[in-house]
Amino acid sequence: RQHEGDITNIEFENGIFSDGALFESGLAYADSDALYLSRPGSMTTFQVTIGYSNPVVESCQTNVLVYDRGGKNAVLTDASSVKAEVALNSAILTGSIGRTGDFLLITDEQGYRTAAAVYSTKGEELFKFSSSELYIVSGGLSPDGRTVAVLGFEQRDASLISHVRFYDVSSGKQISDTELENALGIELCYLDNGSAAVLCDDGLYLVTRRGSSEHALTVGTSDLISVATRDNAMVLAIRSYSGGARSDLYTVRSGSVYGP
């Protein structure tokens, strides 16, 4: 693709930023002061003051979520306005946004280990699960926003057992609970076929809502370079041991693994 002039360039407002995500034809990015929505040509189209210590940005086609990791606040916007502001009583560990704009926040709870809560585009709490036994590390929403998957682990005797649980958002009912023995969960992505891609310290698992699991790819943590999730798909960059390549890229979508 050919580019003319600086049409693909975006100049950051303060020269640096903490996190960013693709949004519409440009970029949503944040520093400790604000969230910015910018288009190529260095044009900032929307700006929200946040004042976060550690901002994290997630996006879908129509909305942008920014939350303060380690803090207690989150903001949801569209391309031109703030849709919801959430102020919590507990510190946010991680979060994600679904295709519908509904979003998930995982928090460190007093009296419990962790909690996972789903919020609507209006900031209303739609679902919450908390546990004193399970430490939740990741989660994601289905494309239609009707179900949520959470990844966590528990200590059983001398072992750490990872769990992948699916819940119905409206009723709060647990659909399934799949144990991944001898695997420590790192990241979960809810795929668009209704299953979950689960990255663990020994590789990638595919877990269905019916409770079945498949060890689809063996990857050691020392070989994992990076992982990213977006639009109900996961991408893995793994150290390569073949030819002159430095890394292999794998894409996980619709319940299948593609690559390298």
Protein language model features and the residues they cover:
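Repeated scaffold domains used in trafficking and secretory/extracellular systems
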Residues: 12-22, 50-62, 90-99, 133-143, ...
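Hydrophobic beta-strand positions that form the internal "hydrophobic ladder"
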Residues: 27, 64, 102-105, 145-148, ...
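Intrinsically disordered, low-complexity segments enriched in Gly and acidic/Ser/Thr residues
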Residues: 209-260
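A short beta-strand motif characteristic of beta-propeller blades
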Residues: 2-12, 41-49, 80-87, 124-130, ...
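Structural motif
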Residues: 34-36, 72-76, 111-117, 157-166, ...
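Solenoidal tandem-repeat scaffolds enriched in leucines and small polar residues
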Residues: 112-205
